[in-house]
Swiss-Prot record:
The lineage of its organism: Eukaryota, Metazoa, Ecdysozoa, Arthropoda, Chelicerata. Residues 1-26 form the signal peptide. This is Evasin P1182. Glycans are attached at residues 45, 72, 103. Salivary chemokine-binding protein which binds to host chemokines CCL2, CCL3, CCL4, CCL8 and CCL18. It comes from Amblyomma maculatum.
Length: 115
């Protein structure tokens, strides 16, 4: 009787391990819909990244940001910045697609394309 019980425990344990292994082999499912948008150009400050401006064209249509901190720099200027060189950038706040400049600056830089 004990042999029969041991066999059942081993069999169930083996099947459970096999099930867990096969259940985790697939790619994780990503249920988020990113909407096929275009990424904004961002500038870093060593600890955080913020968008350069609050609007741009994506496939001919405007995309805007609202209610987040930004750098009051156009995407065109940000793209011309030399990667890794520190710049003084005006901080702002996105309001209806426009980066409203505040009264503070902070060091910002453009990262390399690999980042």
């Amino acid at each position: 009787m004990a042999l029969n019980w041991s066999f059942r425990v081993i069999f169930v344990s083996t099947m459970w391990c096999a099930l867990l292994k096969f259940a985790t082999l697939g790619e994780p499912k990503d249920d988020n819909d990113y909407g096929g948008g275009c990424p904004f150009v961002v500038l870093g400050n060593g600890t955080h990244a913020k968008p350069a401006g609050c609007s741009h064209l994506c496939n001919g249509a405007p995309e805007t940001l609202d209610n987040i901190e930004c750098y009051n720099v156009t995407e065109e200027v940000a793209k011309r910045m030399t990667p890794g060189i520190p710049y003084a950038c005006w901080l702002g706040w996105c309001n209806k697609g426009e980066c409203k400049r505040g009264n503070r600056t902070e060091v910002c830089y453009r990262g390399s394309e690999e980042e």
